[in-house]
Amino acid sequence: MQMFPPSPLFFFLQLLKQSSRRLEHTFVFLRNFSLMLLRYIGKKRRATRFWDPRRGTP
């Protein structure tokens, strides 16, 4: 059985698969991080709106 050298297309497809998986992980992490950040900012904004230091104690 003769062994053929792997084609550049095969290497390219493998690289594309790996990079797309990495990009997917990055995007998922960014989405989760931004959601947490938005939730934190929303809670903080809500808290400052409820407990405004100019009005004194809540």
Curated annotation (Swiss-Prot):
Family matches, as InterPro entries: TARP
Tissue expression remark: Detected at low levels in the ductal cells of the salivary gland but not in the acinar cells (at protein level). Expressed in endometrium (at protein level). Expressed in epithelial cells within the acinar ducts of the prostate.
Pfam families (UniProt xref): TARP
Signal peptide: none
Inducing stimuli: By testosterone.
Miscellaneous comment in the UniProt entry for this protein: Encoded in an alternative reading frame of the T-cell receptor gamma chain gene which is composed of variable (Vgamma), joining (Jgamma), and constant (Cgamma) gene segments. Originates within an intron directly upstream of the Jgamma1.2 gene segment and contains three exons from the Cgamma1 segment. Expressed in prostate cancer and breast cancer cells with little or no expression detected in normal breast tissue. In prostate cancer cells, increases cell growth rate and changes expression levels of a number of genes including up-regulation of CAV1, CAV2, AREG and CXCL1/GRO1 and down-regulation of IL1B. Localizes to the mitochondrion outer membrane in prostate cancer cells. In acute myeloid leukemia cells, shows perinuclear staining and some localization at the endoplasmic reticulum.
Name listed for the protein in its UniProt record: T-cell receptor gamma alternate reading frame protein
Species per Swiss-Prot/TrEMBL record: Homo sapiens (Human)
